[in-house]
């Protein structure tokens, strides 16, 4: 990016920062005045139903095993087959199918393991009806989706402040999240785009909410209480999304995702329902995906 574009970018960052800052302040003050942030007492699922560290570690191990072992192994097998049979590299669409197989197997494996380990615990992690006036699963999902209007401006404001700091300290630097690059790669192939949308809009929110809120946050809550558990699980969630390819953008990404994850953790505790945090996560990813597909270049 040349020097002529620098003032324009600086102005855009300032304008966005002010806009999201005002929205975040006004909307969250209104929500606070209406009692939205009052949590009240919530049951310790991990303590009552025996959620242990070994189960949390196993669930994360299942996820990482598929991501770090299964995907590279299957990719190498397919590449070797094409090299031997056709003397060429496999079409890129094969790797989209690998992605679909992987995320599907991950969700199925997590469910089967958790259900076999303790079906009652799984039931209460997904939806705890022991809280006062529990709503329906659909109601929880919609509640979480609607809370996007509170969480998104805060995350966007923090991201813009971080971008401004990066601009002032290190100069102009553009970056893209790994998931954004993945989505843009699929735009020109309907099949690949459908697989990407399934991964980003359904598989990722369901899997990540189960792992970070349902498992990790529930276990941490037993050890340190609700608020520290939300903060710690949110920090783990943010760090989980870092990548060397994002450069200094990792700073902005980590801070904005941390604030967003705190909303996810709070919504999970407030509604005692994973459907609520999934609703918020799905909405966040859906709006972000819509913006990338229709309002960005490249």
Q: Which functions belong to the PLM regions below?
A:
Residues 138-154, 217:
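Interfacial segments of alpha-helical transmembrane regions
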Residues 68-69, 149-150, 201-202:
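Hydrophobic alpha-helical transmembrane segments of integral membrane proteins
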Residues 79-88, 127-131, 166-175, 220-227:
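Membrane interface segments of multi-pass transport proteins and intramembrane proteases
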Residues 2-28, 153-161, 173-298:
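Transmembrane helix-loop-helix hairpins at the membrane interface
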Residues 90-94, 143, 147, 164, ...:
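Short alpha-helical transmembrane interface motifs in multi-pass membrane proteins
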Residues 1-145, 286-298:
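N-terminal, membrane-interfacial amphipathic/helix-forming hydrophobic leader that caps
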Residues 66-76, 154-166:
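C-terminal TM-helix exit segments that contain a strictly Trp-centered aromatic cap at the helix terminus
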Residues 60-63, 92, 108-110, 121, ...:
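Generic intrinsically disordered, low-complexity segments enriched for polar/acidic and small residues
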């Amino acid at each position: 990016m040349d020097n002529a574009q620098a003032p324009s970018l600086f102005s855009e960052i300032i304008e966005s920062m002010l806009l999201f800052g005002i929205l975040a302040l006004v909307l969250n003050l209104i929500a606070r005045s209406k009692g939205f942030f009052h949590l009240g007492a919530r049951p310790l699922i991990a303590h009552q139903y025996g959620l242990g560290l070994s189960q949390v570690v196993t669930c994360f191990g299942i996820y990482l095993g598929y991501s770090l072992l299964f995907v590279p192994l299957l990719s190498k097998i397919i590449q070797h087959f094409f090299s031997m049979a056709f003397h060429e590299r496999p079409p890129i669409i094969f790797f989209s199918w690998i992605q679909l197989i992987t995320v599907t197997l991950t969700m199925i494996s997590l469910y089967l393991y958790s259900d076999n380990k303790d079906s009652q615990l799984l039931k209460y992690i997904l939806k705890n009806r022991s809280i006062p006036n529990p709503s329906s699963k659909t109601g929880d999902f919609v509640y979480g989706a609607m809370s996007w209007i509170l969480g998104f401006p805060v995350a966007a404001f923090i991201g813009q402040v971080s971008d401004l700091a990066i601009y002032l300290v290190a100069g102009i630097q553009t970056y893209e999240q790994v998931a954004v690059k993945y989505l843009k790669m699929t735009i020109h192939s309907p099949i690949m785009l459908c697989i990407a949308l399934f991964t980003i809009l359904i598989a990722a929110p369901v899997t990540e909410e189960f792992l970070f809120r349902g498992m990790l946050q529930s276990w941490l809550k037993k050890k340190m209480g609700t608020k520290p558990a939300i903060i710690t699980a949110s920090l783990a969630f943010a760090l989980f999304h870092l990548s060397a390819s994002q450069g200094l953008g990792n700073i902005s990404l980590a801070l904005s995702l941390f604030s967003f994850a705190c909303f996810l953790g709070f919504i999970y505790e407030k509604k005692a329902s994973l459907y609520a945090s999934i609703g918020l996560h799905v909405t966040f990813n859906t709006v972000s995906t819509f913006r990338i597909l229709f309002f960005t270049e490249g």
